[in-house]
Amino acid sequence: AAQELGWIFLILTGISVVYGAFSACVQTDLKYINAYSSVSHCGLVLFAILMMNQTACTGAVLQMLSHGLMTALFFALIGMIYGRTHTRDVRELSGLMKIMPFLAVCYVIAGLANLGLSGFIAEMTIFTGSFQHPDTFHRVWTVIACSSIVITAVYILRLVGKILYGTCTNKHHLTLSDATWDERTAVIILIACVAALGMAPWWISGMIGDSVLPITDLFTI
């Protein structure tokens, strides 16, 4: 049934990947942006599983790990920013790099890590495995899903530029405090985990590959 009806779910997941990324581009609430980004990233997990091969499924597990860490980091930073500014509206935030440099730098790291460390590695593993599928239909949808990488770069870079740089337009934000030591410790731990997964993925991808192999072998029976 998975092989016969998988193409239906492939279309649905491919749409969710691209639609989620586009939806994140037009949101003005920081939490909504992160939520729609999660729709896109979680869609990639099911997209990879539907390819039914070891490489793609390894990428799916990496994506779940990466997404869990990245989402926790983003929501933690958003919560810390909201706790100080009392707003999540992108249009009301600007110039935070000068006001709360630690939180701002961590937000930049989180955004770039989503594009270039653990997030990128997981997605590339998924797309590499997807292109290994012998069916042209699956490869076409892989190309469509690949566009989400570019869209993700657009909304993350635009968001970073909007809320962190420029001139602060709200005078009440000028006196806000930066992160406390408790907050810094929590954020640094998450960043360290993201960096470890992104810069040395081989230490866990091998274990994941061995674990998913018996499952993917069932698809070929």
Located regions from the model:
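Cytoplasmic/organellar membrane-interface segments at the starts of transmembrane helices
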Residues: M100-F102, I156-I221
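Hydrophobic transmembrane alpha-helices and their helix-loop junctions in integral membrane proteins
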Residues: A1-K162
